[in-house]
């Protein structure tokens, strides 16, 4: 089921609360603008699956993007999917499974380490951390699969870059810049991501060898 952005002519927000859970881009813009005008530190959260990584952020307000989710557009034949940043990884995987496709960079699943649930992170968090799995050696990291994005900077201004095709960039590729920026450059709102067919077969090998040279020789 694809989602459509709701355009609100009037936005009513309670700026006295400490945690904001917007469901539209317009609400996010107003929240950021208000915090910018009042010089209020704002913490950005998705599904909080990686909140235990790094030091605690000192903030007065929290922007919770867990409600800003959903598949916006998916074209299996054109090998791309467009989603909101708060969309859980598991929902994207389920959608791609219907057409035997995948996120080829294999997002790292730290759910069992931090939250106790598999695939508990959001796609925005994966891109912000640039976390890819072991297949990155063959297919590249997260940043190599981002076709385009929309985001909001610290002043509440909307930023757009790229599109939905591979060769669509002239000048500096901002999609690669925001990957791994941990939310410091923009609040991601939408992402267009390249998808690929699943392999017919796959295997996982565990090599138990304490000697680095022998392990490297085995990998050839």
Which sequence ranges carry the predicted segments?
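Short amphipathic beta-strand starts and helix->beta connectors
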Residues: 2-7, 64-68, 187-192, 217
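Glycine-rich N-terminal segment of FAD-binding domains in flavoprotein oxidoreductases
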Residues: 11-110
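FAD-binding subdomain of flavoenzyme oxidoreductases
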Residues: 105-106, 115-220
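Short, hydrophobic beta-strand segments that form beta-sheet elements in well-ordered domains
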Residues: 4-6, 42-44, 207
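Active-site-proximal helix-loop elements at catalytic-domain edges
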Residues: 2-18, 89, 136-153
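A generic structural signal for ordered alpha-helices
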Residues: 6-13, 49, 70, 127, ...
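Short, functional N-terminal and low-complexity linear motifs
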Residues: 1-2, 58-64, 117, 182-188
